[in-house]
């Protein structure tokens, strides 16, 4: 991130108000640096223009969603409704909605350059791991949303994960964590029985040792959300919880380029992490 704002704030603040003025100057400069980074432009050969990091995140999200939908052979009405629902959830204005729709349509093309688009996205985000994880979180949740995870969808997600720097093992682990996290959301409660009945998801179950039908999240789900095991001690679990909360902090993600329209999704992620941690503590009798 740019440090020029903090530097100028320090100098000007010191001259105008001495020590305390310098402190105020650094704080204001830091806020300025965050805004400059957020609004800074990046190059995109696919989107044919210099765009802000937030616009790059939004357009890449919908382009890959379009490609993911087409991977099954044809784009269904459910896929279109899912994309429309996401646009509504993000409260996109008319201009950004048009950009999102155009990106979704371009993503459906047979010659969509998936690897190139993801590489440019990764560079545009400054290779910030937390921001890249949030992007992948959106794609995985979208793939789960139609109550099945086809092999063709997994193949697309594998490529996305690979280009974002994840190994196959790390990606499989993330899939397990993301499914477990759904149990702590309202959408997870509503759809989990549909997942259990679906053949495509049954294959996914077998890969992870199987999920039992349930009326709500279990402590095993909570362990998967935090990426810990039942044998880990309180300090290990707390450390994993704090790391995930820090990585997924909504305000920090927005400052690093996450569109403000996706703030609610980031908040839901932290709520899932918090709920999982609370359930573990309750089960273990930890305070």
UniProtKB/Swiss-Prot annotation:
Described function: Regulatory DnaK co-chaperone. Direct interaction between DnaK and DjlA is needed for the induction of the wcaABCDE operon, involved in the synthesis of a colanic acid polysaccharide capsule, possibly through activation of the RcsB/RcsC phosphotransfer signaling pathway. The colanic acid capsule may help the bacterium survive conditions outside the host.
Subunit: Homodimer.
J domain span: 221-287
Main location: membrane
Periplasmic domain ranges by topology: 1-6
GO MF terms, alphabetically ordered: protein-folding chaperone binding
Location in the cell: Cell inner membrane
UniProt-recorded name of the protein: Co-chaperone protein DjlA
Pfam family, one: DnaJ
Free-text comment on this protein's domains from its UniProt entry: The transmembrane domain is a dimerization domain.
Domain of life: Bacteria
UniProt keywords, alphabetically: Cell inner membrane, Cell membrane, Chaperone, Membrane, Transmembrane, Transmembrane helix
Segments on the Cytoplasmic face: 31-287
GO CC terms: plasma membrane
Keyword Transcription regulation listed: no
Bilayer-spanning residue ranges: 7-30
């Amino acid at each position: 991130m740019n440090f020029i704002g903090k530097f100028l704030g320090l100098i000007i603040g010191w001259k105008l108000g001495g020590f305390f003025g310098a402190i105020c100057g650094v704080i204001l400069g830091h806020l300025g640096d965050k805004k400059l980074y957020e609004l800074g432009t990046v190059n995109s050969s696919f989107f044919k223009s210099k765009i802000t990091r937030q616009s790059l995140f939004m357009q890449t999200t919908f382009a890959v969603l379009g490609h993911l939908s087409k991977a099954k052979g044809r784009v269904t009405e459910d896929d279109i409704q899912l994309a429309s629902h996401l646009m509504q959830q993000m409260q996109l204005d008319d201009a950004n909605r048009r950009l999102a729709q155009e990106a979704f349509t371009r993503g459906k093309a047979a010659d969509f350059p998936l690897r190139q688009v993801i590489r440019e996205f990764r560079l545009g985000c400054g290779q910030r791991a937390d921001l890249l994880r949030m992007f992948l979180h959106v794609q995985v949740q979208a793939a789960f949303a139609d109550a099945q995870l086809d092999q063709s969808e997994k193949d697309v997600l594998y490529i996305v994960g690979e280009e974002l720097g994840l190994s196959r093992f790390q990606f499989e682990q993330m899939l397990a964590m993301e499914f477990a996290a759904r149990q702590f959301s309202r959408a997870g409660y509503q759809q989990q029985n549909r997942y259990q009945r679906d053949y495509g998801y049954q294959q996914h179950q077998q890969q992870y040792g199987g999920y039992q039908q349930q009326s709500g999240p279990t402590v095993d789900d909570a362990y998967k959300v935090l990426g810990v095991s039942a044998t880990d001690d309180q300090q290990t679990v707390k450390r994993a919880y704090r790391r995930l909360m820090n990585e997924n902090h909504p305000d920090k993600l927005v400052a690093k380029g996450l569109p403000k329209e996706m703030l609610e999704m980031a908040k839901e992620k932290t709520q899932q992490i918090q709920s999982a941690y609370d359930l573990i503590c309750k089960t273990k009798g930890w305070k």
